[in-house]
Amino acid sequence: MSKSALVILAPGAEEMEFIIAADVLRRAGIKVTVAGLNGGEAVKCSRDVQILPDTSLAQVASDKFDVVVLPGGLGGSNAMGESSLVGDLLRSQESGGGLIAAICAAPTVLAKHGVASGKSLTSYPSMKPQLVNNYSYVDDKTVVKDGNLITSRGPGTAYEFALKIAEELAGKEKVQEVAKGLLVAYN
């Protein structure tokens, strides 16, 4: 049975982080569901690119996924942080031992919903003050994995972030194959 990923798409999401995560995971053979936070209509991202989700988050919130991916972008992260549905989903994912992945500003969503407290993580540098009290903050790594949590810093680290998620779900050999096809170095 193939692994599955839920990528939440919220208004103001960082396009690169969203696209790279969804694309890399699909290339690795993972079944990716893109769910719009506010429904199934097109979502305007941080640089005014509009993306059409597969479905609404409400439609799939009770489904089980191997990973829940939170792309960054300040607007998208704020919207996810204010969503009780996202909070319930993340707490369920955490209690069930599922993987959670957050990049850029999205680790603040974890803090707002009380998820993964005490774990090591990283984020976009300006988000650090919102995270240092509840997490072990890592400044010197572009991707941090602590148990079932994967975090990363921003748009420039999106490939490494996505490949790390893919490695967890599809294995090192498959990820090396995907990285090679993308002309991206990955160890």
From Swiss-Prot:
It is found in: Mitochondrion; Cytoplasm; Nucleus. The keyword NAD does not apply. Disruption phenotype: Viable and fertile. Larvae develop normally but show increased oxidative stress-induced cell death. Larvae show structurally normal neuromuscular junctions, however they fail to show structural synaptic plasticity in response to oxygen species (ROS) levels. Adult flies show severe defects in locomotor ability without loss of dopaminergic neurons and increased sensitivity to oxidative stress. Results in altered subcellular localization of Daxx. Does not show more elevated levels of methylglyoxal adducts than controls. One of its GO terms (molecular function) is protein deglycase activity. Keywords: Cytoplasm, Mitochondrion, Nucleus, Oxidation. The active site is at C104 (nucleophile). The modification Cysteine sulfinic acid (-SO2H) is found at C45, C104. Expressed in the head and testis (at protein level). Ubiquitously expressed at constant levels. GO terms for biological process: adult locomotory behavior; cellular response to reactive oxygen species; glycolate biosynthetic process; glyoxal metabolic process; larval locomotory behavior; negative regulation of developmental growth; negative regulation of phosphatidylinositol 3-kinase/protein kinase B signal transduction; regulation of hydrogen peroxide metabolic process. Changing C104 to A/D: Lack of oxidation modification; results in increased sensitivity to oxidative stress. The keyword Protein biosynthesis does not apply. SUPFAM superfamilies: Class I glutamine amidotransferase-like. Oxidation of Cys-45 and Cys-104 in response to oxidative stress. Levels of oxidation increase with age. GO terms for cellular component: cytoplasm; mitochondrion; nucleus. Plays an important role in cell protection against oxidative stress and cell death by acting as a oxidative stress sensor. Does not play a role in methylglyoxal detoxification. Plays a role in mitochondrial function together with Pink1. In motor neurons regulates structural synaptic plasticity of locomotor behavior as part of the PTEN-phosphatidylinositol 3-kinase pathway in response to oxygen species (ROS) levels. This is Protein dj-1beta. It comes from Drosophila melanogaster. The gene is dj-1beta.
